[in-house]
Amino acid sequence: MLGAITLTRWGRYKPIHVLAFAIQTLGLGLFTLQREETTVAQWAVFQCVVSFGGGMIFTTMLPAFQAFVHERDLAACTAAWYFIRLFGHVWGVAIPAAIFNNRVDALLAQGAISDPLIARIISAGGAYQAASAVFVEQFPPALQTEVRAVYRQATQRVFQIAIIFAGFAFLLTLFEKEVELRKTLETEFGLEEIEGRKEKAGTEK
């Protein structure tokens, strides 16, 4: 909301994008600091930082995308934008899942889990599918510690890679082209309909 309000007030999207990606990169870096003993207050603050940056991005990228096209093409432009965004969401799930599972398998190969049965359960994508407190708490305390350590390290790897993506996006925003957003609309939509009504009214009289 803050990003949208700022964009509406000043009509400049590039500074918002630069700041937003910088904040998001910082927030992802904070995520990598999480440990088993991290408090609820700490990870809640970390999430707020990432959400603040991400929210500023999502609410201001569409106007920037639309700024370069003619008003008659805005419908097609908006449809293309949402297609690209949904396509990105697909990769936003697939890539972290692949990174997570690969890291778990690497840790298991290093002997991170002492019980072969549990290691087999969480290998080959099993850890991603079974990620829940109920799953972890069914094991003895010693094995719970091992399983939590595997999950923590795999999750850290996901956020470490995410930092690269966010940092690269931040660098791209430094070279982002900025154009002045429209303050008035010069569209043909609605004019013919109004004129048609006037002609129809004149004919009926």
Q: What is the predicted role of each segment?
A:
Residues T39-V40, F52, V90, L117, ...:
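Short, surface-exposed linear patches
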Residues M1, T32-L33, A109-Q110, I121, ...:
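Alpha-helix boundary/capping detector
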Residues L28, R35, C48, T60, ...:
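A near-ubiquitous, low-amplitude feature marking generic local secondary-structure context
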Residues I84, N102, Y128, G196-E199:
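Short, intrinsically disordered low-complexity segments
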Residues I99-Q144:
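Extracellular/lumenal N-termini and interhelical loops of multi-pass eukaryotic membrane proteins
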Residues M1-I113, T155-E176:
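C-terminal module of multi-pass small-molecule transporters
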Residues A131-K205:
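Transmembrane-helix exit segments and adjacent C-terminal regions of multi-pass membrane proteins
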